[in-house]
């Protein structure tokens, strides 16, 4: 599955409901679907997962499982012990993380058909025992075997999808060509990036009922959708997942300079880390390039906003000198497109290398063409579109499953004269790329649709803001320093969020209960990033802050400073948590990540940070009435 996340749908929705919110700001561009009156939030999948952290896994559970040198076998036996007679299959994206924890995922099946939102993830510790697990398997009544043609025609499901979601797709003459067992590709359609597909799957709906559905995949560029259409009543859409999430020598704003208002451009030489980009940034191991293309990314302008990218304009330099002039006073984007593409290529590659060091490597599902035998599925660099003409005042990232390229689209912003190019705002670029990180890790690389709920989707936005903020902490920053997102592109010192990221409850009053009155994933994400900001500074106060571009590690693979340790624990937590987690579960996964990595050395700092913002030991999740808690577990500090 795939996810699409946008930067500027970001979080301005829901601000009016906050009595103490800042004055309303101009609303950045909505998605094309919302412009056509389609509310995708109404079709979000239910959040079903349960997460059992390491300190709650019963000892008897491990005692009942025969020891095995194959961690997948251990995980499989554990699932059998928990789910009884439920049928399931092993997903092929299992791997061992850099913290020594193996991640194994299973998909529930009914009548040999996948239950698309029923997942079981088992985390196996370095000792070979079950460390923690997540479970969203269906436990209700199982329907009988299907009778041939018990279901509607897949073409009807495609047409219903187009009609209900008002998609810009012509399916009037669509024909279904078999691709596999109850899996079809549609021909004679137009309006999509690639041919639409439909597959018969079960889905657990919001009423906890098991529905047989056609999963219809349509990539219309602005939205890359998995639409679940009732296979009995094909006019009814049961749920929707959107893969798109809205944000040599190179003359660039160097790493650490967030945008043109924060510093100056300079020429950097061979900026790649050969340990994480072994072919450099301008080769994929098979071909060497003299342009902004390589193993991790391909960058170009896309003024038409179309789907083609391979033959779009990008700068070329036989001498490998990507040095181009740029001034913020230039009014014509064409006049500085070389500088824009180069900056986007540089920032995305630098972030790729950093994430690789922190654990988002080939086996974990990162974005590379040639994985060089390191695991995972290749052929999936990130397509980086600068000056994308499909919109303004936004940015987005589409995350398909491992093995298909990610797609980032960076727009021009019109809140200033001249317009501002978001490719020069590293915070926006990092925000967008982080959607690829969180969607690939949560639920496993083969399932990029595990942040499709309101709270889990909100955390997706929060992780993106958090990582961008952590990267750009300044050398003189302290826990009293506040940070905002998008202030340069938005031409507003307050940025694009309701509040700055701050450890002050006066400056930013959000606590877990605040989420009850927030609407939209970007507003929810602001709270989550606020909680993580508290954790970040607690760890920095304990371990110090490394202001270098890359972390240093001790002999056990633990970052030696608080900033990179916080980022590492957040990333490791993503891999531990279940599909579509809530914030209490994600908190527990980060706490577990610390146990796995450091033996629990930072439990006090983590709990104190979360509890300050209402995610203490008594916090409870409910989609309509979250209960906050400021209490710490007994003896944790």
Curated annotation (Swiss-Prot):
Organism from which the protein derives: Fusarium vanettenii (strain ATCC MYA-4622 / CBS 123669 / FGSC 9596 / NRRL 45880 / 77-13-4)
InterPro entries: FTP_domain, Fungal_virulence_M36, Peptidase_M36, Peptidase_M4/M1_CTD_sf
Family: Belongs to the peptidase M36 family.
List of residues binding Zn(2+): 431, 435
EC number from the UniProt entry: 3.4.24.-
GO terms for cellular component: extracellular region
GO biological process: proteolysis
UniProt-annotated catalytic positions: 432
Signal sequence interval, chain numbering: 1-21
GO MF terms, alphabetically ordered: metalloendopeptidase activity; zinc ion binding
Matching SUPFAM superfamilies: Metalloproteases ('zincins'), catalytic domain
Cofactor: Zn(2+)
Protein name as it appears in the record: Extracellular metalloproteinase MEP
Glycosylated sites: 288
Positions of the propeptide segment: 22-246
Job description of the protein: Secreted metalloproteinase that probably acts as a virulence factor. Cleaves Z.mays Endochitinase A (CHIA) between residues 'Gly-29' and 'Cys-30'.
Pfam families, per database record: FTP, Peptidase_M36
